[in-house]
Amino acid sequence: MKYDGYIQSSDYEDLYFDIIQPNIINLNLLFAGFKPVKNKHYLELGFGMGRSLLTHAVSNEGHFVGTDFNENQVAFAKNICEQAKISNLTLYADSFEQLLERFRKMRAKGEEVSFDFIVLHGIYCWVNEENRQIILSIIKEFLREGGVVYISYNCLPGRATNMDARHIFKLYSQNENTENFDKIFSFTEKFAQLEPENTINKNILDTINTHRHSHPIYRIHEFLCDSWYLPYFSDMAETMKKLGDLNYICECVLAYHFKKFTPKQENFLAQINDVIFKEQMKDFILNKRFRYDLYGKELLKLSDKQIDDYLFYTQFVLLDYPTSHTFKDCEENLKWAYIELISRLENEDFTPKSAKTLMMGIDINQRVFFSLLINLMTLNLVGICMPNTTRKIDEVKFYNHSLLKNQKLSEEYIFACALTGGGISLDSLERAFLNHYFNENQMNLEELFERIYQNENFHFNDANNQACKDRESVFTQLSLHYKKFLRRLPILMKLEMF
């Protein structure tokens, strides 16, 4: 079943995207030289199962709104919202057209309807032209001055190599009335093997091999929807510019602000003054397949001193410890700097530290320092830390405990954190251990280990990376995992998540 070209026969994956967290967006704005967005009136278009929106609403002050026209997905998100008593979240099961009409009626009645953040992750290229125009109307009419739009999408040139395969997948699916990708891949692969050295067929085979083990639901949404819009970045930038006073700010990927090109590439790019043209040429250099764009409406440009002031007084907090392999391939001086940063964040009982405090006495320049900090964030070892209210911290604790109670033993899950304003992942073992920690009277540790051992969804390898097959070797690995959990536990408690 499809709605305006979008697949509705299956619910989308239950995924979390920290890239659309307000504090992460604001840090990207800072690195791009713009003042962060102060208020958090936030709209997500096409929120899927709602994991990101739920997490961000419960973790932040402000008001959060979202719509998705898959009623099953909205019902799932609403159920969690009601159980967790999230007070600042409004969820609609509207199409984009219905949402636009709803907002216009609300405004006509004198209600305040405008947003500081409008985000849409991945859906723009999966809906038809009519819906893309409606999305643009929502942005044009309801984005506040000083607000930002986050929009991510499949793009050219990188996706060009998937176009032929996708076309065959779609035709086979329609003709055989199937969404079974074993059959779709089998047919397409047989065709490509007729002349495997042909460039087109090589691309088809590469597409199949790349997605052979992708999540089945993702494959259906990616390749079988009626609309598969593939713009170049410059096309998207031109589209957004036509909305009026909406300018490209940066790619909303923290590590991209520190992206290094070769000297030849840098020299070539240096001759291009136009921001959009230069960014497009970077996409050609990198063969970009997917973009995460930020556009701003009359944002305030900061001076270098103002940027430094904001950055150096931004606080960061430890989220987890690195493993023995995390910095294995780093240069020695960088390895030392990473370890020193982790040590400083660990000091004073894991109290959040400003960038200025963390950098003090470390003999590296500012750009390298922030690139190291961002790398630690990318590894989910460090998080940005913003002050929050007692009310929000209490809401987060209630939300997280409700997740602990309701999820299956073997599920990895995203928990909310009011200090970071976003989600923190706990793997299935950490979640099981945490549940035991709060309910120790219900089961002793050996009983928990036995329960995990009997669960077919858990698999363990020994120190030689061989599968553990007997009870004793599994219990040995569980003991090691439990020690690791006990080391992380004080961090989780300091984050006031539970």
Question: How does the language model describe each region?
Answer:
Residues 10-40:
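Conserved alpha-helix/loop element of class I SAM-dependent methyltransferases that forms part
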